[in-house]
């Protein structure tokens, strides 16, 4: 979580602030587990969007660091973007590769706008979406979700010299000029909780949201912890405000912070196969992966 509002993981969060993953730790029976997962993939009929049963087609924005981004080469294990000379990497790509390996499939990345992700998986053009999606009831009515592959708490970003830099609660943000990304929990659910906030139009992408803050167009932006932690690398003048998840924080449900992999309704075999992979991972695994993603993300993201 972008825990954005509207299936393949392999990284995790630098700050999982008290949030724990529900996957069980891996045991020593790796080969049997891999065989079981591969069998589930076979049973799924490998319903790839391109009709190739050897390929797992995964959609993402490729513009949402540290979850996913675009780069010009295959450094760090990046995967080529379908129909492009560019490559994609990040936490989501790492997870996609981990799942693809377990299923015995090559990963193909499809770059799409945020609002096109759910329609693409519903139509069968792609097998799954791994893009920092929150597992919301609204989305679950349209697609099936895996178990969470990350848990992302909500934070606020502002500049170090801002009047809001010492804020210790949502109430302390009163009167702030604020924005966030279009179609996200952050914009739709969190910003309205700020007393007397001057809420600007939503930004199309996470990078444009950060640019708005950096340029002085707004006082604060609300986002998730991985996005905020990554932003501190690219924008050293920013500071991250974490209100601790209690009464002083933004009031959100578990679904708002559980990040899952979406797939077409009824694709139970693929869902089960992905969940088998996730069940071998722990919260520490997720956090280690996210730390790695943040450490290698392009500063422009």
Language model features: what each stretch is:
Residues 45, 51-133:
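Extracytoplasmic small-molecule ligand-binding "clamshell" domains
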Residues 116, 132-142, 189-192, 215, ...:
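A ligand-binding cleft/hinge motif common to bilobed small-molecule-binding domains
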Residues 5, 18-34:
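Bacterial lipoprotein signal-peptidase II cleavage site
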Residues 60-64, 110-115, 124-136, 152, ...:
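Beta->alpha turn/N-cap motifs
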Residues 65, 85-101, 133, 155-210, ...:
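Bilobed "Venus flytrap"/periplasmic-binding protein-like clamshell domains
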Residues 185-202, 242, 272-301:
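Ligand-binding clefts/hinges and TM-proximal coupling segments of bilobed small-molecule sensing domains
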Residues 101, 106-172, 252:
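Acidic, polar ligand-binding/catalytic clefts
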Residues 151-158, 234-278, 296-301:
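Periplasmic-binding protein-like
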